Regions:
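Acidic, His/Gly-rich catalytic cores of divalent-metal-dependent hydrolytic chemistry
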Residues: 125-210
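His/acidic metal-ligating clusters that form di-metal
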Residues: 55-123, 210
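Active-site environment of divalent metal-dependent phosphoester hydrolases
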Residues: 1-3, 29-34, 85-87, 111-123, ...
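Short, well-ordered secondary-structure micro-motifs
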Residues: 35-37, 90, 121-124, 190-192
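Charged helix-capping and loop-helix junction motifs
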Residues: 6-9, 93-99, 133
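Core catalytic region of metal-dependent phosphoesterases/phosphodiesterases
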Residues: 1-62
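Structural motif
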Residues: 22-23, 109-110, 147-149
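Divalent metal-coordination and catalytic microenvironments
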Residues: 12, 27, 65, 81, ...
Length: 210
């Protein structure tokens, strides 16, 4: 969706080169830009952005993205782009969907993305269904007494009506997760998107976190 796809991929390459244990996953839009998913399946704005992005990526960017998994396990945590049941496409947005997904990973916690909404689902021992909760700036989630599905949100296009970049910090020793939100220069990003002739709807939504 953004105006600097090459720089984003280069940053991921640098992070994994300097720290080989860093984990990066491929998402549905990445796969669409590689031609593995038909861009015609996306809404018109996303399709237009995807076609523009595909033309910005060099062969080295494409090869890197094509080498990434959509799901992996690292340091005792499951990581999936969308969901453990369907790592590329499924949106975890409801109690039934979240509950069903706990049967598709074996670790105590699974980190997901795709919806661009910071949230968690907890399945406690003996419970028949998961509990859903939002992750707000400064929230600390203790990863004990339940199994968890956790979405840290999006740094580039949040969709929970908070336009600040969203991320979380995982403390693997204390087994806690701290949710964070930070301001960034949205207007600068929007100007760069305008110069690239990306769809207005994608620019405007950044101001509102939708």
């Amino acid at each position: 969706y953004g105006p600097r796809p090459r720089e984003c991929v280069d940053t991921m390459v640098d992070l994994t080169f300097t720290r080989p244990d860093n984990q990066v996953l491929v998402g549905n839009h990445d796969l669409a830009c590689l031609g593995d998913i038909d861009l015609a399946e996306f809404n018109p704005a996303a399709e237009a952005a995807g076609r523009w992005t595909a033309h910005q990526l060099g062969m080295d960017h494409q090869e890197y993205l094509g080498s990434l998994p959509a799901m992996t396990i690292a340091e005792g945590y499951t990581l999936a782009h969308a969901s453990p049941r369907s790592p590329v496409w499924e949106y975890v947005t409801s109690v039934p969907i979240a509950t069903d997904n706990f049967g598709h990973f074996d670790t105590d916690a699974c980190f997901i993305g795709h919806t661009h909404v910071a949230m968690f689902a907890a399945l406690r021992p003996g419970a028949s269904h998961a509990e859903l909760g939002q992750l707000r700036d400064g929230d600390v989630l203790e990863l004990s007494g339940a199994r968890f599905l956790i979405n840290p949100g999006s740094v580039g296009q949040p969709r929970d009506r908070d336009p600040r970049a969203a991320f979380s910090i995982l403390d693997t020793v204390a087994r806690t997760l701290t949710a964070r939100r930070v301001e960034y220069d949205i207007a600068k990003t929007q100007r760069q998107m305008a110069l690239a002739n990306l769809p207005d709807v994608l620019m405007n939504r950044l101001s509102h976190g939708i």
